[in-house]
Amino acid sequence: MDSFSQKLNTYAQLAVEVGVNVQKGQYVVVNASTDVRDFVRLIVKHAYEKGAKNVTVNWQDDEVAKLKYELAPFEAFEEYPEWEAKGREELAKNGAAFISVVSSNPDLLKGIDSKRIAAFQKAAGKALHTYRQYIQSDKVSWTVVGAASAGWAHKVFPGKSEEEAIHLLWEEIFKATRVNEDNPVQAWINHDQNLHEKVDHLNERHYAALHYQAEGTDLTIKLPRKHVWAGAGSVNESGHEFMANMPTEEVFTLPQKDGVDGVVSSTKPLSYGGNIIENFTLTFENGRIVDIKAEKGEDILKELVETDEGSHYLGEVALVPYDSPISQSNILFYNTLFDENASNHLAIGSAYAFNIEGGKQMSREELVKEGLNESITHVDFMIGSKDMNIDGITADGKREPIFRNGNWAF
């Protein structure tokens, strides 16, 4: 086996063993593009070798998806197959593990009417709401990993041949996911422990609010009374550990739904719905987005915010140091899984139940009462920079440094 094949094999093994931590007799579901079938086959192989009972692959084809957006009647985007939504719910109910492989060309739907994209996102969000609750409350094991496709690689490395661009992107993915380490599994265990030290400190301090300051950003975010910081490894309902994102460099919690005030500016392009949104600013009053400006993709961003009532509010606050390995690579991935781990970020839309103390056991009404935002969407956008300072504000109004010049201050 050559060096690349070995790395690809190791990466697939990590997705199965560290990502979702497949258990004997478990169902496994893989969502992936036909563009990265060789990698997906390795995932399937390792899942069965770990004892999976049945591995199902939901294949997507980017070009087929694009043809639908170009040629299908508008009403096709206002519906989502009930059998597919119910199938996912049933699998989640039975404790399946879900692996999502992201590889799409960030410009796939460039030039497509934003209303078509918004209609589909809304229909899918509504249909998959119950399934996503299993995911967002960590009832089941799930992970998101990246795989290099020609379309994505060309965007990240323009001017290179297709073969070279794909090779370069794979190498960056391997670096970011610790595949190149002597013992990748142990490297992930060590990384998990390091992130949990930050989580423990923030949970101990239990700040009432955060204040962000940087060029184009002056934002105060109140945190719910029962907020909990999380990061790296998670534990599902059955007590099994898993790693929801590979890579991951973040520690995160949720904001008080109505407690966000001020202005925040993006620092990296946002890839959303097959389009790129760049250089945007959001203004908040009492938690709600009241003004949107973007140099590129403003219509797409506005459609996102108009998805439902909850998409006018934030659902996640995540801290990532400017000197994180992905940030230091100085590569813009045009993919949220990677770019969010190079930068502090926020998320428009739904919050995670596990970010509230006892949240996994709470009803929807109880969670809302505690300040959790509900939405059919959840979209991260990047706001971190090397000049960003963040203060933690205690219940009695004392300020303590969390970030200085883009990096941890404790």
Curated annotation (Swiss-Prot):
Sites where the protein binds a divalent metal cation 2: 316, 340, 378, 380
Keywords per UniProt: Aminopeptidase, Hydrolase, Metal-binding, Metalloprotease, Protease, Zinc
UniProt GO BP: proteolysis
GO MF terms held by the record: aminopeptidase activity; metal ion binding; metallopeptidase activity
The enzyme's E.C. designation: 3.4.11.-
Binding site residues for a divalent metal cation 1: 250, 316, 340, 345
Note describing how the cofactor binds: Binds 2 divalent metal cations per subunit. Can use cobalt, zinc, and possibly also magnesium ions.
Pfam family, one: Peptidase_M29
Cofactor(s) listed in the protein's UniProt record: Co(2+); Zn(2+); Mg(2+)
Gene3D superfamilies registered for this protein in UniProt: Thermophilic metalloprotease (M29)
Function: Metal-dependent exopeptidase.
Family the entry assigns: Belongs to the peptidase M29 family.
Name this polypeptide is given: Aminopeptidase AmpS
Native source species: Bacillus subtilis (strain 168)
